[in-house]
Each structure stands twice: as structure tokens, then as C-alpha cells.
Amino acid sequence: MNYRQAYELSLRDPEQFWGDAATRITWRKPPSKILDDTEAPFYRWFSDGVLNTCENALDRHVSAGNGQRPALIYDSPVTSTQRIYTYEELRQQTALFAGALQSLGVGKGDRVIIYMPMIPEAVIAMLACARIGAVHSVVFGGFAARELAIRIDAARPKVVVSASCGIEPTRVVEYKPLLDQAVDMAEHRPERCVILQRPEAEAAIQEPRDIEWTTLMSSASPADCVPVAATDPLYVLYTSGTTAKPKGVVRDNGGHAVALHWSMENIYDIGPGEVWWAASDVGWVVGHSYIVYAPLIVGATTILYEGKPVGTPDAGAFWRVVEQHGVNSLFTAPTAIRAIKKEDPDGKFVGSFDMSTLKTLFLAGERLDPDTWHWATDKLAVPVIDHWWQTETGWPIAANPYGMEPMPIKPGSPTVAMPGYDVRALDDQGHEVPPGKEGALCIKLPLPPGTLPTLWQDDDRFVSAYLEQFDGFYLTGDEGHVDEDGYLYVMGRTDDVINVAGHRLSTGTMEAVIAAHPAVAECAVIGVNDDVKGQVPRGFVVLKAGAAIDTDRLREELVRSVREQIGAIASLREVDVVPALPKTRSGKILRRTMRAVVEGRDEPVPSTIEDPSVLTALRSGA
């Protein structure tokens, strides 16, 4: 079946298409019902199927005689450590930690927060939750205490699994003090905290709440896989929304396993025994889908890399990993390639390593600018494939289906919509716009398997955030267009979520921190273009009347507050003091107009603006 046939079948007869795809995974009870639309718009896939995701990722490969195949390669330049786990070893460790969680009272449906760096134990903890039907919620290691506390209250975990520290190229980040602060701030109290001690920074243990990983494992008995319904949640992943309260994206077990298996074979062209490297973090959706679950479900070898594209030790770090481990396909964010290009513009490091095993480079997480695409294509001499998806979808919306039918690449486009995704560009009235014209990118319901069925304990917000604006469509929050060949072009967000180095951050959350400063009357944070990170936040503040504070001191205090309350990942560096913010007559801040002014673009002034002279002051300061 070629791409066009597969795509048309998926829209015309989704039950046949996804029913066939579902035969590629292992079921305890195969589904007889493929798509359940009885409670639309809450669609459910494989609603009467029963399976276990950990069994699909580990046990079935061991049972098939492939237990000695490498499952996970841990490569940590920051600790000078490397370790290979076979499928059998990873299964044993996962079963043991699953039993350890059971000994702490964790069972089917209970939540477990995982707050860890890029170490094998993070993967083991995720798979162990899946093994016993518990619901994991991974929080990016080193996220600020306040953000962690919000997620503790939202997920209400029985147990938190953490490590004593994470390791950056220039410093050790102690996690335990952040965890302790978060638990103190949160209203919900986790019953136990499991702490993996790392030699770089030992954590103080608070008994009886805290227990060390090694102590817990030493008395644990291995747990068997617990069968769960296909529609039971596998995990909740919190993503930045346009309000301070993060959205808990729910991933179900059945649709997730089916979609990820399909994507590995048909998009990424990776199968059993091949070496796959998603250079991301387990705290983000790419880490969930393509470091942990998808490569293991298809029986590939996945690489877990605790390092950076540059600085661990240099801009050749990625190419060293490719050579040393025989990587067949690499997936990272454009930011990583831009960082390497900045340090090594001529690509000298690329030529220092044997890259002959590498057949493709996949990029996603933010818009891929054509300059970066050309550089990577030229230096690596392999297809560089842009693709587009979201935390909410869990797997690509648009891609070049390399495993099915490689298509001509158009720089600046993530190619075409994948099966199950009926993508349209709509105008403000919900009408489809002609090819080449910008609109809100939306997906006609139902969404395919593997995408979010709802938000955690918040059906109303799921509807209001994604389904309300255009009847019968899911709102991606991105704007763009479709060309005459059906290729998609994604131009940017339509809301106040910005994309910093492939990480989604809410400007609203940053604004809340800045607005709390006693000298600030009001503020706005916008995302501005950055050569390396894609976007970085820039703050604009209006001072309270009579506020006597040095501008440089104010800037330092605000940058520090954002770093402490949100985390270094926020990357706020620039804060400008302005006399007023441009607003509509209804009081809405014109962020898009502000972005255009700051970036020097000539954009029409909205007719709804209250005071056009405010833009003049902004231009003189920009």
C-alpha cells in the first residue's frame, strides 16, 4: 500500500485501517470494537481490548527468543558512563521495580510522579508503572519546586520517584531540595518518595516518607504484567497551557501502542534490532513516545543520552554517539542542530567520525528553518526529515512516511498529513481556506489512535481548549497552510505558548511571576525569534506610578524570579521597561503585534487597538 492509498483508507474506513494496524501488537484480549463513537466527541479506540504496554515493550521480545538483543544503551558523557541493557536485563529490572512499587501500595490506576534525569532508572520506573497498570506522570528533572508542586496537586500521586541530582555540563543540580520544597508547597501529600542516590550529590533522607532506591529493590519481588483495558490511562503528561494551570494530557494504553508501532515501521523505518536514537528528554513527549515506548515496542535498540549537543565535550558529541553505537536513525530538535552549527559551522566534526550507519535525521519540536535543513542535509549527506506533532497527539500529525513511501522533500514543510489525521486550514468562520492561504490548522474528528482522549479529570477543559472553536474539529493551536500538493506548512502558535528549544512554555506562567514583583503594574511576555533556540521569551513591564527602582536591578530580579519559579529552561534574559502595553479596546494585549514590532516586521495595526501611539514607544525601544 502506498501513502495515498493508506491515507485515504484511514479516513474512509478507519476501523479497517486501524484494525489491521492493531494486529501488530500483543493483546490479552484482541478488540472486536475498533472505534467507539457512542460518547463523541470523546472517541475511544479498541474499547473492549485488553493488553499490557510493558509486555509489548519487553516481555514479548524475551518470549520470542530475543532476550539477549540490546534494548537500551545508556550513554552519559557527563558521568563518563556507558551501559548496555539487554531486553532480558531491562525486563528483570523493570519487573523488580514494579514489585517494589507494589510493596509501597501502588496498584492499578494509582499515580506515580517520576522526577528524574536521563538515567536508566527513569525508563525502568516508567515501564514498571506500565507493568502494574499504574499511571505515571513524568516531570522534567530540575523543574522548579512550584511547578512540581502544581503537578503533585494535579496528579495526586501515591509515590514520587526521584534521584538525588541531575548533572549539567557545568554544574550538579540537586533535585531532592526541590522535591522537598514541592511536597511542602503542595496540598496533596505523596505517601512515599523513592530516592536514587547518585554519587555526585547525596540526598538527605527523611524517614519514614523517603526510601532509597537500592534499599527498596533489595527486598522486592518481581511483578507480573497486569492486564489493563485499552482505554485505561498509561500516563498523564502535563503541558503548558495558556493559563497558569497545566493541562494533563492523557495517553491510553491500546491506541498508544498501536499508533507508535505503526509510526516506527511506516514513518521512521525502524524495525527489530536496529539502533534508534531520540535525543530528547524523558520529561517531554518525545522522550515518552520515542526514547521509551515506540522503539521497545518494535524490538529496536534505543539510546538514552545524558548529555548535550555541544559542551559534552564539544560539537562532535552527537556524531561520536552515532559512530560508537551504530545509530541507524537520529531524531532531535532543530535547536540541537542549530547549536552544533553555531559551534562548528563548517561541519568539521562530522567528518571526524564514521557516520556510515546513519540513514536518516528526523527533526521536530519546533519549526525547522530552511537554513538549518540545508546545513544538515549538506553536512550529513542523509535525508533530513522535518515532521510536526504535539504533546497532545503523541505521534506525528504530518511527516514524510519514510518507511512506507519516501516523498520529495520541500524545505520548510513537514510534508503530508499522516493516516488518521484529516488536517485542514480554516478561517475564523470555520471554512476551509484555499491552498496556500494561511489559516488555523485543525484536524477533523475523530483523532486517530494514540492521541489524547481527554485531559486528566477535566473533560470540560478538553472540550473548551481543543474542540469548541470549530465544530467537529480539533484545534492544534498552530497556524499555517496546505499547498496544492497537500504539503503542510506550519508557521507558528496562535496562542501564548512559545517554543523554546523544542520545549513548550506558557508565557502566561512567566507573566504571573513577573507581575508579582512589587514595582510592576502590568507585563507581557512574548516569544521572539532566536538563531539557536528558535524562540526565547522577552518581557515587557510597565512600572507602578512612583516605583523607584533601577532598571538593571529590576531586570536582574525578574530574571532570577522566573528562573527560581519556573526553571532555567524558561531562558528569560531580556526585560524592557515600557510606558504602556498595546491593547485592544476590550483590554486584550496584542502579543502578535508586539512580536512584529520587536522583530522589525511591518504588520498592519489591528483596527481594535486602543492607543496606536503605544506602538511608537515600543518601536523606539525595540
Feature map (PLM): residue ranges:
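Conserved AMP-binding/adenylate-forming core of the ANL superfamily
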Residues: C54-E55, L72-L127, A144-A149, I205-T215, ...
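Conserved pre-ATP/AMP-binding loop-to-beta segment of ANL
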Residues: Q68-P70, C193-L196, Q206-Y238, K245, ...
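Structural core segment of the AMP-binding/adenylate-forming
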Residues: L127, R131-T215, G326, A333-P334
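AMP-binding/adenylate-forming catalytic core of the ANL superfamily
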Residues: V139-S164, L179, E323, L330, ...
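AMP-binding/adenylate-forming catalytic domain of the ANL superfamily
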Residues: E191, I195-Q197, V532-Q535, E564-I589, ...
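Conserved AMP-binding/adenylation subdomain of ANL enzymes
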Residues: A257-V275, V285-S329, K342-K348
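Gly/Ser/Thr-rich phosphate-binding loop
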Residues: A300, N328-S329, K341-P408, D422
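Conserved ATP/PPi-binding loop(s) of AMP-dependent carboxylate-activating enzymes
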Residues: V416-G420, H431-Y466, L505, D602-E603
